[in-house]
Each structure stands twice: as C-alpha cells, then as structure tokens.
C-alpha cells in the first residue's frame, strides 16, 4: 500500500432514484487505481440500510433492477447508516490517496457527487474539485467517432463494484482507441 498523489479514486453509488432531495444512497463502492488505470485496491462494498417505506417508493425500474441483482435484500439486511458507510470509505481512501488529490472518477459522476454532497459531505470533500468522467469520452466518441461505441460492451449489473470495474475498463478502451497515447493519431 502506497499513498500517492497520482492515484485515482473511482466511485459508484446505487440510489433509490435520481433526485437527491427525495432519494437515498443504497450502495457505495470504491476502487483505487494508479495513474495508468491499474487496480491497486478495492474498497469496501457497502449496502446502506434504508427503510422499507423508501424502498417501496422506488420507480418500477429501480425495484426490478435492484431486486434482480440482490441489492434490495442486502439493503434490508444491512444495519449500516450512510454516515458509517461514509467513514468506512474514507478510512480506506486515506491509505491510498491524500485528501484533495484525486478527482472523482467514474461514469456520470456528477450525479454521484450530488448525492455525496447531500448525504456524505465529508466524503464529497475528500475529492479534488475536478471530475474524471468516462461518460464525457463516450459522448465525444458518439459525435466524433461513433464506430468506437461498438467496441466496448457493458454488462450493466447496476452493482457499484461491477460498475466501477466497467468504468475503468471503458476508460482504458477509449485511451487505447480514441485518445491513442502512443502518438499514432490516424
């Protein structure tokens, strides 16, 4: 384990919906990579307890998806609060990345950050203010090189750790096929 300013913190949240004013976090996971996207460590994968009433108010899509992947059962069985999950995550990150060094990394991370600001503000503050959002490259590829979109396929399990692994792999794909760091810009 080595604390390094260049390490990247990857995060994904699963929520009961998309509106942080009315919805809550039900799962959080993190992975730390080096600057070259090699996985150094996987953080705790934490199901956050939420009330049956809140879970029952989820959209049909959320109920179907989070029931099929087992997350609803894990949330109901969990005793973990959002605050406890936040502190466990920060304790893990402190071993790998200094506070304020890493941008928040993942897919559509602005959405995750909205929930972090609302429910896990200390964790939100752990990140640099910049974002490393893989979905930006996806949107650019869609417009400038749409043929690249067929080269990477996601499983979309909507489990936080799986989603992070896919985000890292997707960024590596775009690095190799879109950004082309080797200087071969055809």
Curated annotation (Swiss-Prot):
One Gene Ontology term from the biological process aspect of the record: DNA metabolic process
GO molecular function, one term: 3'-5'-RNA exonuclease activity
Classification via InterPro entries: Exonuclease_RNaseT/DNA_pol3, Oligoribonuclease, RNaseH-like_sf, RNaseH_sf
Keyword annotations from UniProtKB, A to Z: Cytoplasm, Exonuclease, Hydrolase, Nuclease
Pfam families, per the entry: RNase_T
Residues at the catalytic site: 129
GO CC term, one of those recorded: cytoplasm
Signal peptide feature range: none
Ranges where the Exonuclease domain occurs: 8-171
Domain of life of the organism encoding this protein: Bacteria
EC class of the enzyme, as a word: hydrolase
Localization (cell): Cytoplasm
E.C. code: 3.1.15.-
SUPFAM superfamilies with a match to the protein in the record: Ribonuclease H-like
Its biological purpose: 3'-to-5' exoribonuclease specific for small oligoribonucleotides.
PANTHER family (alphabetical): OLIGORIBONUCLEASE, MITOCHONDRIAL
Family statement: Belongs to the oligoribonuclease family.
Protein name: Oligoribonuclease
Biological source species: Mannheimia succiniciproducens (strain KCTC 0769BP / MBEL55E)
């Amino acid at each position: 384990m080595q604390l390094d300013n260049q390490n990247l913190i990857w995060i994904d949240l699963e929520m009961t919906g998309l509106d942080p004013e009315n919805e809550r976090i039900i799962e959080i996971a993190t992975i730390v990579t080096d600057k070259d996207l090699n996985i150094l460590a996987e953080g705790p994968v934490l199901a956050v307890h939420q009330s049956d009433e809140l879970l029952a108010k989820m959209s049909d899509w959320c109920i179907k998806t989070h029931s099929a992947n087992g997350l609803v059962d894990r949330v109901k069985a969990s005793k973990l609060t959002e605050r406890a999950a936040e502190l466990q995550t920060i304790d893990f990150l402190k071993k790998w990345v200094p506070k304020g060094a890493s941008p928040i990394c993942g897919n559509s991370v602005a959405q995750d950050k909205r929930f972090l600001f609302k429910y896990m503000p200390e964790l939100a503050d752990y990140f640099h203010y910049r974002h490393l959002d893989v979905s930006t490259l996806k949107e650019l590829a869609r417009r400038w090189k749409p043929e690249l979109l067929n080269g990477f396929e996601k499983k979309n399990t909507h489990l936080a750790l799986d989603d992070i692994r896919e985000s890292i792999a997707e960024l590596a794909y775009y690095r190799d096929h879109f950004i082309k760091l080797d200087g071969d810009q055809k």
